[in-house]
Amino acid sequence: MKPIAHIHTDLPQKFGIPRNSFLAPHLQGRIIFEPEFALDTAVEGLDEFSHLWLLWEFQNGTPGGAAADIAADLATKDKSGATSKWTPSVRPPRLGGVERRGVFATRSPFRPNPIGLTCVKLDHVELTPQGPVIHVLAADLRDGTPIYDIKPYIPFADCHPEATGGWIEDAPWHELEVDFPDQLRARFAALAEASKLEGLIEVLHQDPRRAGSKHEPDRVYHLAYAGLDVAFTVDRDVLHVLGVD
């Protein structure tokens, strides 16, 4: 198999990528086709659907991306994405990174085959001289992730109201409160597209830190987003944005 496209998002590094799609519903993404598949006829009728399935590839244990950004992950001493080796049991973030579950009962990236499956909202299809561009929302993918297939979400086949969520139902995710001063919001809007601010705030709500991170209220974290460096601290349940550069 070979990629048919790559998705471009505002998250170039592993740090900050939502742990599932739709946790940051306003996070923007653009799917750019490889020249062989950049044909208007290939997407005819796609804009009649509201949601899509994306099949994609994990690279080095994380959604794919540029080598420089993967190296930046390693420089932070987060080794969780440094190898693609799979393990039969994993520690899901939703369980605080402590309890284990079987890999096939989770969506861990450390699998026998590095295949990812994501549902996204279709915003619109743009036809350009270079080929169609699919604009999506709510993806949980790093910038540059290779896409292997795109399929429409079909409600009568894909939606199962009676479905149960297993152990996840007993482990609700706790979001952080985000303190984002007005002057820093204005600075973000001056340096980047204002429409990207809502997605950033949603990413911060999800707590970008590793599951089980110890309480270090004075530690300054840095999130790469939309070409900017967003600095913040976390004190208990509140994330404080300190700077946008």
Role assignments for model-derived ranges:
Residues M1-C119, D123-D245:
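Glycine-rich, low-complexity intrinsically disordered segments
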